Amino acid sequence: MENILLGIVQGLTEFLPVSSSGHLAIFTAIFNKTPDVGYFAFLHLATFLAVVIFVKKEIFEIINGVFKKDEKYITLSLKLFVSMIPAAIVGIFFEDFIKSIFSETFFIGVFLAITGVFMLLSDKMDKNLKTITKIPYLDAFIIGIFQAFSVLPGISRSGSTLFAALLLGVKKEDAVKYSFLMSLPVIFGAGVLEMQKTVITKEYVYGFIVAFLTGILGLHLLKKMVIAGKLKFFGYYCFLASLFVIFYI
């Protein structure tokens, strides 16, 4: 039962801007049990697959465009690479150090509140100027910096990158697509690097399926909420989660 519940938590919170790491802390406190690292990594692969399904059209267009030497898609792929650089550097060299300092529940609560602020501000941004192929290199790097912040427990990866993209004037639907295209290597890497010597059990498979299905649901829900300008509701939720973490965990 706990494995299934963790699959639901991972599938939804990996994509909804409420911080999967913050909710992992809540899960750990409620059940007084830290989830197995290998199992959590396996769930990352489920959410990776969910993203691939969600942006399959864009992935095909980019790959096809690169092979056809279409400058627009070659440039887009390079910008996505630029966006991945900050998270890669932080993840490789500083992740363990950062988490060792900021893994206390007080900090998790504070960072959840910051994610909430991001969501409230995101709803007020409606420039809708840039499509996914018109994002400048500098903007791509800035969005990448915000993605790197998500190494802090309680900072939502999707929330921070959406906030940055909308702040920089990217169209809402394109901000969602770009956020999840640039997340693919991060999610896949998180799964593969920590799955070494993991024995996959029947319970793991059940959790994988649940995480995949709830991940698909979470992706479509987020897209609708962004377009409808209702990210503030995620912000309110983050504030409540922040208070719960600070005062009850």
UniProtKB/Swiss-Prot annotation:
Keywords: Cell membrane, Hydrolase, Membrane, Transmembrane, Transmembrane helix. Its EC number is 3.6.1.27. It catalyses: di-trans,octa-cis-undecaprenyl diphosphate + H2O = di-trans,octa-cis-undecaprenyl phosphate + phosphate + H(+). It holds the Pfam family BacA. GO terms for cellular component: plasma membrane. It comes from the Archaea. It is found in: Cell membrane. InterPro entries: UppP. It is a multi-pass membrane protein. GO terms for molecular function: undecaprenyl-diphosphatase activity. The chain crosses the membrane at residues 11-31, 35-55, 74-94, 101-121, 135-155, 175-195, 208-228, 229-249. Its main location: membrane. Catalyzes the dephosphorylation of undecaprenyl diphosphate (UPP). Belongs to the UppP family. PANTHER family: UNDECAPRENYL-DIPHOSPHATASE. This is Undecaprenyl-diphosphatase.
